[in-house]
Amino acid sequence: VLREYVVDPFEIMRVAESMAKPVHPLPAARKIGEAVAFFTAPEAPHGQPPSRHKSYPVVNEANGLIAMVSRADALRWMVSGWDSEKTLGEQLLGQNLLVGHEDELVGKLADRMAEADAGRVPILRRGATDEESTVVGLVARRDLLRVRAQVIRHERDREQLIRLRGTAGARGR
């Protein structure tokens, strides 16, 4: 009897191996209007990274995570209007955030994302205190699917190799 045991990569891979990086957080002091322009501009303003993600971490002066802001937030503010003097930090204060850590297992984070129906999660490097933790990446559902797709490709390649070996062995008899 031949039995194969498969190791689930979600249970051995660390988040650091699957997260998108580098992260370009937005400062909490940025005005709402500037954030709307960032998300809606066809090209990035001079000296800034292009808005290629759907959401970004918002950090304080000490680079501590305080919120996440999304393109959907910016579009909602465009439609409903916004206080031109309000900052991202003021607008997003009290946001309930799901975070991950770079040393965490991908499977644990995927479970928490599924339970919270979270599409994107900021990833932190652990500091001595929560305030000292810094944002080092983002994990989106597509990053988790990429891990799963890699496993499927490896399994398909392995099956083809086994079939080829079986065919070669049958010819030699």
Residue ranges and their predicted role:
Residues 10-20, 29-35, 84-92, 103-109:
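Short, structural beta-strand-to-alpha-helix junction motif
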